[in-house]
């Protein structure tokens, strides 16, 4: 279970994972050794799963965000494994979920423009048989985006 200090460390790291061990320890009123041990435990427990740099998609030429809803008539484990393999190998897919409700799957896709989206779409539908409905919506404006989880 996470205690108050663990939660504070996680909140700090979500805001800036480049903080030094010394800065983190001071922020939670610990010395560096117990702070390091907590961080190590959080990693070992799979709570801290990576440290990354976040990029601005528009500034690197990937300004089109698409949300793709998919329906399928196929639900066998073989088909599912093939579908998951194909989708997880597509670098344009930033998020991929199996859903409850009207649609079976949801993808978040990031590409340069509509031409690149069309290429992605064709690759997707030609790689996986049995997609009965592929509906795409395109983001006009990003109002909020965060990778920080609400830690309380």
UniProtKB/Swiss-Prot annotation:
Gene3D superfamilies: 3.30.70.920, Winged helix-like DNA-binding domain superfamily/Winged helix DNA-binding domain. It holds the Pfam family AsnC_trans_reg. Disruption phenotype: Slightly increased sensitivity to excess L-cysteine, the effect is more pronounced in M9 minimal medium. Loss of expression of dlsT(yhaO)-yhaM operon. Cells no longer produce hydrogen sulfide in the presence of excess cysteine. Residues 21-40 bind DNA. GO terms for molecular function: sequence-specific DNA binding. InterPro entries: ArsR-like_HTH, AsnC-type_HTH_dom, Dimeric_a/b-barrel, Tscrpt_reg_AsnC-like, Tscrpt_reg_AsnC/Lrp_C, Tscrpt_reg_HTH_AsnC-type_CS, WH-like_DNA-bd_sf, WH_DNA-bd_sf. One of its GO terms (biological process) is response to amino acid. The keyword Cytoplasm does not apply. Keywords: Activator, DNA-binding, Transcription, Transcription regulation. The keyword Signal does not apply. Residues 2-63 form the HTH asnC-type domain. It comes from the Bacteria. Plays a role in L-cysteine detoxification. Binds to the dlsT(yhaO)-yhaM operon promoter in the presence but not absence of L-cysteine; activates transcription from the dlsT(yhaO)-yhaM operon. No other DNA target was identified in strain K12 / BW25113. Thiosulfate does not activate its transcription function. Overexpression doubles hydrogen sulfide production in the presence of cysteine. This is DNA-binding transcriptional activator DecR. It comes from Escherichia coli (strain K12). The lineage of its organism: Bacteria, Pseudomonadati, Pseudomonadota, Gammaproteobacteria, Enterobacterales. The gene is decR.
